[in-house]
Amino acid sequence: MAPDPWFSTYDSTCQIAQEIAEKIQQRNQYERNGENTTKLTVTIRALLQKLKEKIALLKDLLLRAVATHQITQLEGDRRQNLLDDLVTRERLLLASFKNEGAEPDLIRSSLMTGGAKRGAPNPWLLEEPEETRGLGFDEIRQQQQKIIQEQDAGLDALSSIISRQKQMGQEIGNELDEQNEIIDDLANLVENTDEKLRTETRRVNLVDRKSTSCGMIMVILLLLVAIVVVAVWPTK
């Protein structure tokens, strides 16, 4: 699975924030020792600007991912929480850079080798979600990717179910078409049979009428013969 560009950008942004915290601590140490801090100050300013641009990029990527439904609303909310934490960290770093507030203890507590580890609280995450509390950046990313994979698997299963239902619907439709064709054939057969029956009935009636007429003619002929015979029969 290809790495998520949002989390790749998020990791690099966190690294920049970590580097800024280290540079600010180093600058403060130089100031206490009376050393020149001009070069460090320029570097910190450049890093702060880069951090600002990275956060803006993260916001843009998140908005596009949510708008195009590349991620779920729940995943969008989780990423927004991480982004809010970065914005808070940026403000604290900017305040520390300007020497506003008692930042040295805060910066020292943020300097953890290799980033945040499991079980080691991150002082920059003032309201860290319960799901990600005590997790490092890599672990958070893995957790988010696992959630996305589970959601993708659920969507694949749903798509498979819908495809099967669609196929069943098509099969039922084909079967109904076949049944309709059979019914149409039966209707045509019944109609043809009925027409034949009517034709044969007419023929039978015609034959019957002819037979009746022939019988009457025979009776008349017999009567005529009888009359003739009686007429010519000699009488005493």
Swiss-Prot record:
Q: Tell me its family.
A: Belongs to the syntaxin family.
Please give the residue ranges for the topological domain Vesicular: 233-236
- Which GO molecular function, any one, fits this protein according to its record? SNAP receptor activity
GO CC terms: endomembrane system; intracellular membrane-bounded organelle; SNARE complex
Q: Which GO terms describe its biological process?
A: intracellular protein transport; vesicle docking; vesicle fusion
Q: Where are the transmembrane segments?
A: 216-232
**Keyword Transport tagged:** yes
Under the subunit heading, UniProt states: Forms a SNARE complex with STX7, VTI1B and VAMP8 which functions in the homotypic fusion of late endosomes. Part of the SNARE core complex containing STX7, VAMP8 and VTI1B. Interacts with VAMP8. Interacts with HECTD3. Interacts with TPC1.
- Entry superkingdom: Eukaryota
Annotated membrane topology: Single-pass type IV membrane protein
| UniProtKB keywords | Coiled coil, Membrane, Phosphoprotein, Transmembrane, Transmembrane helix, Transport, Ubl conjugation
Q: Which positions are tagged coiled coil?
A: 42-65
Cytoplasmic topological segments: 1-215
Q: Which gene encodes it?
A: STX8
Identification of the protein by name: Syntaxin-8
- Post-translational note: Ubiquitinated by HECTD3.
Every t-SNARE coiled-coil homology domain range: 145-207
Q: Pfam families from the entry?
A: SNARE (PF05739)
Q: Which CDD domains match?
A: SNARE_Syntaxin8
What's the stated role of this polypeptide?
A: Vesicle trafficking protein that functions in the early secretory pathway, possibly by mediating retrograde transport from cis-Golgi membranes to the ER.
Which compartment or compartments is the protein found in?
Answer: Membrane
Modified sites of kind Phosphoserine: 160
